[in-house]
């Protein structure tokens, strides 16, 4: 239940920024069973924001909340970072080009922040 509590905090905290994203993509409960209180679990955190500073503040808050939850519940935790990537905002000029093309096709233009970084990180380098 501690992880569920953390996940709810992460959702609220990310929403408070307006454009941050915090997700748990993996949740593993070794030897889990429907009638057993688990003694251990492993989970992933994915934190994204439009700037490194905003993401780092989100990370600090999430890890502080994790520590507080564990303290209150008499649990312990370890955290291991597996990947860190810089925020990769797309060029305003490229955004304008895409918006013009979409509008020229007679389609509505919608702006949204995408936390997806795979292609954006590479295009950001140009």
Residue ranges: model-predicted function:
Residues 4-126:
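Metal-dependent amide/peptide-bond hydrolase catalytic core
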């Amino acid at each position: 239940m501690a992880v569920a509590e953390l996940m709810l905090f992460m959702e609220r905290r990310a929403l408070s920024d307006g454009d941050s994203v915090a997700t748990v993509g993996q949740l593993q409960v070794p030897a889990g069973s429907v009638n057993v209180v688990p003694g251990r679990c492993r989970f992933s955190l994915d934190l994204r924001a439009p700037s490194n500073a905003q993401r780092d503040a989100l990370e600090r808050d999430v890890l502080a909340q994790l520590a507080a939850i564990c303290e209150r519940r008499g649990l312990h935790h370890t955290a291991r970072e597996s990947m860190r990537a810089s925020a990769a905002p797309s060029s305003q000029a490229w955004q304008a080009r895409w918006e013009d093309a979409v509008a020229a096709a007679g389609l509505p233009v919608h702006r949204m922040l995408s936390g997806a970084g795979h292609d954006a990180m590479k295009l950001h380098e140009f």
